[in-house]
Each structure stands twice: as C-alpha cells, then as structure tokens.
Amino acid sequence: MNLPSDPFEFQRTGKIAKNRIVLAAMTNKQSHEDGTLSNAEIDWLVHRAKGGFGIITTAATHVSKDGQSWDGEFGVFDDLHIGRLNKLTSLVRKEGSLCFAQLFHGGCQSSERLTGSVPISSSINTSKGSKSGYSLEAKEKDIKRIVEDFTKAANRCVAAGFDGVELHGAHGYLISQFLGKKTNTRQDMWGGDLKGRSRFLLEIYRSIKDLVPDSFIVG
C-alpha cells in the first residue's frame, strides 16, 4: 500500500513527484492588471513548495484576454507572461516539486468590466459579469479561437518550464458550460448529446497534445 509520502511516477511521461501531496488550485487575486504574476503570488506558491508539496498547482489562469473572471487573476494569454511564469517554475523546481498551471476561460462568468467584452458561453446564459445580465452564444469562429487560445497557453507553459497543465472543467466555467445540459442548449455539433457537449473539451485536449512534448502532462 502506498503512503502519501511515497513518490509518484506519471507512467506516460516518466515525471516523478517526490510525494503524493498536491497543492490544489486556489485563487489568490494578487497579480497585476496585465495578467503578469506578482511577487506576492509567486512567493505564496513557492512557500507551499518549501512546505513539502510534491505538486504545486497554480490558481486558475485565463487563456484568453476575454476569459478573465476576477481582479488580480494572472493570465497566460500573451508571451509577455512567460518571464514571470518561468521565475515561478524555477523556484518551485528548486524545492524539488513539480509545477502545474490550471488553464481556464470564464465563459459567462467572465467580467465585462475587466475585459471590455460581453461574456460568451456555450449558449445564451445568465451572466453576473455582463452588463446586460446575459452572455452571448459562442459562434463557430469563437469556439475555434478559444481552442487555439488554450493550445497557445499550454505551449507558453511549456516555454515557462511547467511540468504540465490542468484543464479546469468545473465550477461553471466555460468548459463546464459546454458540458452541462442546462448551460449548453445548442443543436449543432457542439451541443446535444454527451458526445456533442464534450467535443469542446476533447478538441482542446487533442489540440494541446498534438503540440506539446510527450513529457508534458495534460489533465
């Protein structure tokens, strides 16, 4: 029987976590308006690595400029973010921990006040972040663009030294909105039955896996 203190090997990649204790993604709201990581947020995560966590997971980071949901949320939608992200991963690795980034898009939970854009979702849904109270339904071009944004964001994480990424499919954000029956009422290939509703998530996953190295973890 394995103990929490035992190392864990990711069989498909060969990466080894020094133990089975994982820091979950937790929102800090400490970073800068342009999406770059602040020293305060870096220090918070590194302190947890020093505390012995085998895997450090960042807070949710938006892959598209229009996917931001709250103040102080760091981003990975632009190459300008790579430098600060690399500082984080270097310091975490120095403590012997793996480092994962949690990638997400807020969808109808994005903030029009912060992004300047009306939130988009799988369908027209209520939206506290929208001035009108409702999101727009994502068009085909929006979906393809966001899939590409997730892919580019994952590639930036590779460049920044992350060991992998976690696709945030919970808490009512965009991936979850596509998966849900109540939030996805589309009748095209992106909705309907479970196969259609899961297409968005699977397209993101496949697109990322086609681009990143085999040693990079995607979950």
Can you annotate each of these PLM segments?
Residues 63-64, 76, 112-138, 177-198:
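Aromatic- and acidic-residue-enriched carbohydrate-binding clefts of CAZyme catalytic domains
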Residues 20-22, 55, 98-102, 164-166, ...:
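Structural preference for beta-strand elements that scaffold enzyme active sites
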Residues 23, 48, 52, 92, ...:
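Conserved, mostly hydrophobic/aromatic
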Residues 73-100, 179-218:
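Alpha-helix-loop-beta-strand connector modules within alpha/beta enzyme cores
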Residues 42-64, 159-164:
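Catalytic domains of carbohydrate-active enzymes, especially glycoside hydrolases
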Residues 1-25, 92:
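N-terminal amphipathic alpha-helix/helix-capping segment at the start of soluble metabolic enzymes
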Residues 32-50, 74-94, 111-114, 140-155, ...:
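Glycine-rich anion/phosphate-binding loops
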